[in-house]
């Protein structure tokens, strides 16, 4: 997605060979116009999947998930990382290791919001080692629902998360795929495009 790549190049900051900071538009301050475009792109890519629900994880996945849900006309449910006094029982639970925070979180979804007939699109801001997506898949599978696809805003293609998910037969659509963050420079994966005649 060209507009996203341009935003990453202009406002993203490479902190190391593994870490890209995009708090200027995605995971602290949110650019609503960009999020709207991201939502439209996810909806376009998954329009044939008959999605009934979008599942994400708090907090940075919520904005792109809501925008995609608006386009698809479905609801969003986000996995919580912290226990809530209002959500104590009847929860699906999974453990997820956070690459960025270097810690394991217990994530949960309420059983009353996801059902076995749901066709779920998982959306998240980043894909690195795949732990968040695998944890969300576990929650969906515990409900007996089906994962119709995974939408990722930014994939670190140099890490193995995308490979793990695709090897499981899951359709993964990433809007920006980063090949490298070496030497403080963002390099995107180059896809061959067929010549139109």
Swiss-Prot record:
Sample GO molecular function, one term: xanthine phosphoribosyltransferase activity
Gene Ontology biological process terms from the UniProt entry: purine ribonucleoside salvage; xanthine metabolic process; XMP salvage
Pathway(s) per entry: Purine metabolism; XMP biosynthesis via salvage pathway; XMP from xanthine: step 1/1
Enzyme class: transferase
Subcellular location: Cytoplasm
CDD domains: PRTases_typeI (cd06223)
UniProtKB keywords: Cytoplasm, Glycosyltransferase, Purine salvage, Transferase
Entry EC no(s): 2.4.2.22
Positions contributing to xanthine binding: 20, 27, 156
Binding locations of 5-phospho-alpha-D-ribose 1-diphosphate: 128-132
Keyword Glycosyltransferase carried by entry: yes
Family: Belongs to the purine/pyrimidine phosphoribosyltransferase family. Xpt subfamily.
Function: Converts the preformed base xanthine, a product of nucleic acid breakdown, to xanthosine 5'-monophosphate (XMP), so it can be reused for RNA or DNA synthesis.
Subunit structure: Homodimer.
Protein name: Xanthine phosphoribosyltransferase
Species whose genome carries this gene: Bacillus cytotoxicus (strain DSM 22905 / CIP 110041 / 391-98 / NVH 391-98)
Gene: xpt
